[in-house]
UniProtKB/Swiss-Prot annotation:
A Pfam family assignment: Cation_ATPase_N
Compositionally biased spans, kind Basic and acidic residues: 299-308, 342-354
Annotated positions of the Phosphothreonine modification: T1079, T1113
SUPFAM superfamilies xref list: Calcium ATPase, transduction domain A, Calcium ATPase, transmembrane domain M, HAD-like, Metal cation-transporting ATPase, ATP-binding domain N
Region (Calmodulin-binding subdomain B): 1115-1124
Record keyword Cell membrane present: yes
Binding site for Mg(2+): D794, D798
Tissue spec. comment: Expressed predominantly in brain and skeletal muscle. Expressed in the molecular layer of the cerebellar cortex, in particular in granule cells (at protein level). Expressed in aldosterone producing glomerulosa cells of adrenal glands (at protein level). Detected at low levels in various tissues including testis, stomach, small intestine, and large intestine.
Annotated transmembrane regions: 98-118, 156-176, 365-384, 418-435, 850-869, 880-900, 921-943, 962-983, 1003-1024, 1035-1056
Bias (Polar residues) ranges: 1-19
Name of the protein this chain belongs to: Plasma membrane calcium-transporting ATPase 3
Length: 1258
């Protein structure tokens, strides 16, 4: 210790063993000493603690804290600790400045083209050839221009430049506000993170950022450790340290062998208490974080140089593969200095379960690329036609010769043609689409927070709208999670109510009180109500709270028992987990013997009982026949009432021979049953209605629970998941596995496809069963469309299922940190109704995007045709470049804001899910787009060719190069904008509804934007002048423009009258690429194609997925870092790391190890994002939670994760009606079809079948 102290801080004298030396703040150890201590592991660390502090209690004394009482909750003391030892917080790197965002916006290819064209146009406008040369060059423009007009030629170029500046500023502001929004979301996620500490002897939940050195923290199963610490007392504690050490095996921690607990690691089993020794940048995780960021500047420069040198092809080949696959497009890699990094990722990619890209993202990607290509082709054709027309007319028809002095004049024309071509491109590309997606998602996420949905992955919000199946937990989600004991079996008597204490013998009562008080987490308590008349507060595990409440109902108290036998005197604890389904605690008796108390699921624990207490409290033999009688007469009736049954038992061991405590099967056996209690967990009153809504919306709800089959069936019936007369399956985990596995024990998809369509309840299930079910439903090919599955989970071992599902919901109250980390959405109230709201918001996002597409594509179709046709016929576009920038970039931005903020309505839940293959642009929408385009084109071409006669004004066609704005073309522009404004109102409805004004005043943003856009248009037309190529219009002309605009609403009614079913010729657009449509190679090629489109087309096209993934990109960095070794450990383990990398393909669970150098640059790049981790414990918010880090302890039953695109055989016809004794018999059996559709059209009527679901046809 002295060596380390001297090497770390030279001015400190070498401390003597166990001798306190006063340090800064009066504490007995320095920050450097604690940092040095936390670098050690195992026996080395124990020796250091003994040499320097004597033991852990000595360390606590040095830190002026009590191992049992914790810190005094004194503000001054806490602040002093933060000043000396640091805060549990890593300062984030400053977000990009507004100027940096402006510079990014300027990198857009289309804008650069416009800038160049504008500058060239500006330069040439100042060149005027002599008069005689001008005559020799010819007046190919169709008219002469006077001197004043020629002098004003610079205005067009300047106006385009000004418009580009406006667009850049708007884009930069949008990016800035978006980043600000994401920072707010990140801040919200941070605030949700709390940890349990002891202060003043009281258990408190404090934000992780409020932890200080010296805090006594409670550690329990499922926690993500927020700081470094030393274990004071632990019960069967196992930690997953793979995020720091790369070791995939769980590490057993104990106060006498390895007490070192590190931040960022997961508690996979057990519980305990630790003293916090390092926080923030001084913790092991924080040290690595800081070191990785330190060299970021240099690495960033290297990256920039590398990016300049790399070609587009090379950069596209080094795409980083997102490991949860939930993003639409593969993002650019966060480059590392190590070439092997990429290869290692590629090797691992096949082993990591991937979610498919989100439905909307996949469709938008395809649509954006298609539109972009069409725009490029149209603009190229336009330029070619204009140039050929000019060349043929000038040099062939007029027979002129190219004179050197005429070159600037001709170039001026070519520049004009080029600008027109760029205008067509600008018009074709839906610039507002990415913004509409971002706004819609951001708006929905913000509103969903109020509906108790904390969205961690933005795309999950939209994916939820397509959900076809929800696999829900029971406890706390469908039920209130306020449990109470309502029935019990004690002393050979079945009590339907709480028995009077006098009815029980003292021995039974004492044993019961001790068994419950001691064999429960000491952090679980019943506290007095906060308000008079309210219910007592339940703190901790709800099942244990119910048992403690049972003691209080028997007029006894658990607290004196716990004070008599404190937690640190417990001899051995077998903590609860999903495999054991029980908890056991061993205490030493006064005579030197031992007593074991055990509680757990009644069917499991009763099998281990060989005795039972009779009415006198005496032991009586408990034979298998007795157990069967008890199951039939006691447990099944309780379960049929919807009660959870818990058995409480004990066993005594003599002092003569101490058993082998590690042999759990031997120890927890030969038990004596004290009692069986029935615990009621009432169904939430709002849940049955929520499930009815789901069923109406075409979503099948399945309950997956660890409870008894009878309990689960009773609760499912109360919730409405199963109904009388419906053919369904209720299976236990064992029966489920028997049905889906072959003789070799392997899962067969065909077998699974026979089970899941009818399955409604899966009882006595393990987390592995849940993962198998979710994977089986997702991989199934029995239907026309791939199922979109949502799953709820709260336990550490639910991680695989949460990650595998399309949308994973974690419980905000009861959920572990690991479950939250693996999820997409956190239910802050643990309520199923919040999931229904998420469905509604998801569908609303989909509709909002479709509304905007309907509006945007109408604008695009009309503008492209007008610009293309007008340019080819009149050699000039009726809609000028500046006007197009206004319409397409600014006005559409407002439209995206207006249409993307429409609030959801209950009617969204009255239709079936869209499904993965349902196009973004339905036939009804295509009818609307083309119908309105026909109206608008008819009006515009009429105005273009005969408008001057109708209004008795000069024609604007074939005007000279720099002629002043004409009233003719201004009327065309104004009419075009008015039609778009009123069509924006039409676009609010996309399913053929007639009342387009329905609910319009419930969206003030929409009303404000429509009126605001109208006001700006008035200003542009009346005062825009030459910059906007506008001439002021008279009142009469304005009224005509408005009249034509209002005609859009009337025309919309005409279009709504035409039945879509009659228009067979209409095609749909924006289909999502199906999972079975493409091979892996084709998918890879598609990604390459998208990457090229990224470079060729306007940045706006890919802004939508950049917005969706902005948080995920940063989280990827944290995930990469999590799989790294500590800075010191990385050096020590370098050789073992390399050997493991060679063997990685041979491991069923790859060990994720990274050398620090490999991601200095990537981590630093992530840190400059505004949503960078402001606290190192934001791992809860990390989207990249790798199942592989712990999957080996939850063995996956098959290995089909490797290839998700593998062709699967169609399932044979469904089996005959269920004969399993776990199923409820039904007089009416509904036929399950081999192919199903997620849309309502798939359901045909069948007499005598009053019920329906996604798996049954009516």
């Amino acid at each position: 210790m002295g060596d380390m102290a001297n090497s770390s801080i030279e001015f400190h004298p070498k401390p003597q063993q166990q001798r306190e030396v006063p340090h800064v703040g009066g504490f007995g150890c320095t920050l450097a000493e604690l940092r040095s201590l936390m670098e050690l592991r195992g026996a080395e660390a124990l020796q250091k603690i003994q040499e320097a502090y004597g033991d852990v209690s000595g360390l606590c004394r040095r830190l002026k804290t009590s191992p049992t009482e914790g810190l005094a909750d004194n503000t001054n003391d806490l602040e002093k600790r933060r000043q000396i030892y640091g805060q549990n917080f890593i300062p984030p790197k400053q977000p990009k400045t507004f100027l940096q965002l402006v510079w990014e916006a300027l990198q857009d290819v289309t804008l650069i083209i416009l800038e160049v064209a504008a500058i060239v146009s500006l330069g040439l406008s100042f060149y005027a050839p002599p008069g005689e040369e001008s005559e020799a060059c010819g007046n190919v423009s169709g008219g002469a221009e006077d001197e004043g007009e020629a002098e004003a030629g610079w205005i067009e170029g300047a106006a385009i430049l000004l418009s580009v500046i406006c667009v850049v500023l708007v884009t930069a502001f949008n990016d800035w506000s978006k980043e600000k929004q994401f920072r707010g979301l990140q801040s919200r996620i941070e605030q949700e993170q709390k940890f349990t500490v002891i202060r003043n002897g009281q258990l408190l939940q404090v934000p992780v950022a409020a932890l200080v050195v010296g805090d006594i923290a409670q550690v329990k199963y499922g926690d993500l450790l927020p700081a470094d610490g030393v274990l004071i007392q632990g019960n069967d504690l196992k930690i997953d340290e793979s995020s720091l050490t790369g070791e995939s095996d769980h590490v057993r921690k104990s106060a006498d062998k390895d007490p070192m607990l590190l931040s960022g690691t997961h508690v996979m089993e057990g519980s305990g208490r630790m003293v916090v020794t390092a926080v923030g940048v001084n913790s092991q995780t924080g040290i690595i974080f800081t070191l990785l960021g330190a060299g970021g500047e240099e690495e960033e420069k290297k990256d920039k140089k590398g990016k300049q040198q790399d070609g587009a092809m090379e950069s596209s080949q080094t795409k980083a593969k997102k490991q949860d696959g939930a993003v639409a497009m593969e993002m650019q890699p966060l480059k590392s200095a190590e070439g092997g990094e990429m290869e290692e990722r590629e090797k691992k990619k096949a082993n990591v379960p991937k979610k498919e890209k989100s439905v909307l993202q996949g469709k938008l990607t395809k649509l954006a690329v298609q539109i972009g290509k069409a725009g490029l082709v149209m603009s190229a054709i336009t330029v070619i036609i204009l140039v050929l027309y000019f060349v043929i007319e000038t040099f062939v028809v007029d027979g002129r010769v190219w004179l050197a002095e005429c070159t600037p004049v001709y170039v001026q024309y070519f520049v004009k043609f080029f600008i027109i071509g760029v205008t067509v491109l600008v018009v074709a590309v839906p610039e507002g689409l990415p913004l509409a997606v971002t706004i819609s998602l951001a708006y929905s996420v913000k509103k969903m927070m109020k509906d108790n949905n904390l969205v961690r992955h933005l795309d999950a919000c939209e994916t939820m709208g397509n959900a076809t199946a929800i696999c829900s937990d029971k406890t706390g989600t469908l039920t209130t999670n306020r449990m109470t004991v309502v029935q019990s079996y004690l002393g050979d008597t079945h009590y339907k109510e709480i028995p009077a204490p006098s009815a029980l013998t003292p021995k039974i009562l004492d044993l019961l009180v001790h068994a419950i008080s001691i064999n429960s987490a000491y952090t679980t308590k019943i506290l007095p109500p906060e308000k008079e008349g309210a219910l007592p507060r339940q703190v901790g595990n709800k099942t244990e709270c119910a048992l403690l409440g049972f003691i209080l109902d028997l007029k006894r108290d658990f607290q004196p028992v716990r004070e008599q036998i404190p937690e640190d005197q417990l001899y051995k604890v077998y903590t609860f987990n999903s495999v054991r389904k029980s908890m056991s605690t061993v205490i030493r008796m006064p005579d030197g013997g031992f007593r074991l108390f055990s509680k757990g699921a009644s069917e499991i624990l009763l099998k281990k009982c060989t005795n039972i207490l009779n009415s006198n409290g005496e032991l009586r033999g408990f034979r298998p026949r007795d157990r069967d009688d008890m199951v039939k007469k006691i447990i099944e009736p309780m379960a049929c009432d919807g009660l959870r049954t818990i058995c409480i038992a004990y066993r005594d061991f003599s002092a003569i021979q101490e058993p082998d405590w590690d042999n759990e099967n031997e120890v927890v056996g030969d038990l004596t049953c004290i009692a069986v209690v029935g615990i009621e967990d009432p169904v939430r009153p709002e849940v049955p209605e929520a499930i009815r809504k789901c069923q109406r919306a075409g979503i099948t709800v399945r309950m997956v629970t660890g409870d008894n089959i009878n309990t689960a069936r009773a609760i499912a019936a109360k919730c409405g998941i199963i109904q009388p007369g419906e053919d369904f399956l209720c299976l236990e985990g064992k029966e489920f596995n028997r049905r889906i596995r072959n003789e070799k024990g392997e899962i067969e998809q065909e077998r699974l496809d026979k089970v899941w369509p009818k399955l409604r309840v899966l009882a006595r299930s393990s987390p592995t069963d849940k993962h198998t079910l979710v994977k089986g439903i997702i991989d199934s090919t029995t239907g026309e469309q791939r199922q979109v599955v949502a799953v709820t989970g709260d336990g550490t071992n639910d991680g695989p299922a949460l990650k595998k599902a399309d949308v994973g919901f974690a419980m905000g109250i009861a959920g572990t940190d690991v479950a939250k980390e693996a999820s997409d959405i956190i239910l802050t109230d643990d309520n199923f109704t919040s999931i229904v709201k998420a469905v509604m918001w998801g569908r609303n996002v989909y509709d909002s995007i479709s509304k905007f597409l309907q509006f945007q594509l109408t604008v695009n179709v009309v503008a492209v045709i007008v610009a293309f046709t007008g340019a080819c016929i009149t050699q000039d576009s009726p809609l000028k470049a500046v006007q197009m920038l206004w319409v397409n970039l600014i006005m559409d931005t407002f439209a995206s804001l207006a249409l993307a903020t429409e609030p959801p309505t209950e009617s969204l839940l009255l239709r079936k899910p869209y499904g993965r293959d349902k196009p973004l642009i339905s036939r009804t929408m295509m009818k609307n787009i083309l119908g309105h385009a026909v109206y608008q084109l008819t009006i515009i071409f009429t105005l273009l060719f005969v408008g001057e006669l109708f209004f008795d004004i000069d024609s604007g066609r074939n005007a000279p190069l720099h002629s002043p704005p004409s009233e003719h073309y201004t009327i065309i522009f104004n009419t075009f904008v008015m039609m778009q404004l009123f069509n924006e109102i039409n676009a609010r409805k996309i399913h053929g509804e007639r009342n387009v004004f329905d609910g319009i005043f419930s969206n003030p943003i929409f009303c404000t934007i429509v009126l605001g856009t109208f006001g700006i248009q008035i200003v542009i037309v009346q005062f825009g002048g030459k910059p906007f190529s506008c001439s002021p219009l008279s009142t009469e002309q304005w009224l005509w423009c408005l009249f034509v605009g209002v005609g859009e609403l009337v025309w919309g009614q005409v279009i709504a009258t035409i039945p879509t079913s009659q228009l067979k010729c209409l095609k749909e657009a924006g289909h999502g690429p199906g999972k079975d449509e493409m091979t892996d190679e084709e998918l890879a090629e598609g990604e390459e194609e998208i990457d090229h489109a990224e470079r060729e087309l306007r940045r706006g096209q890919i802004l939508w997925f950049r917005g969706l993934n902005r948080i995920q990109t940063q989280m990827e960095v944290v995930s990469t870092f999590k799989r790294s070794g500590s800075f010191q450990g990385a050096v020590r383990r370098r050789s073992s790391v390399l050997s493991q990398l060679h063997d990685v393909t041979n491991l069923s669970t790859p060990t994720h190890i990274r050398v620090v150098k490999a991601f200095r640059s990537s981590l630093y790049e992530g840190l400059e994002k505004p949503e960078s981790k402001s606290c190192i414990h934001n791992f809860m918010a990390t989207p990249e939670f790798l199942i592989n880090d712990y999957t080996h302890n939850i063995p996956l039953i098959d290995d089909t994760d490797v290839d998700e695109n593998e062709e699967r055989l169609r399932a044979p016809p469904p089996p005959p009606p269920n004969q399993n004794n776990n199923a409820i018999d039904s007089g009416i059996y509904l036929t399950t079809h081999a192919t199903k559709s997620a849309t309502s059209s798939a359901f045909s009527s069948r007499p005598g079948s009053p019920l329906h679901s996604m798996e049954t046809s009516l």
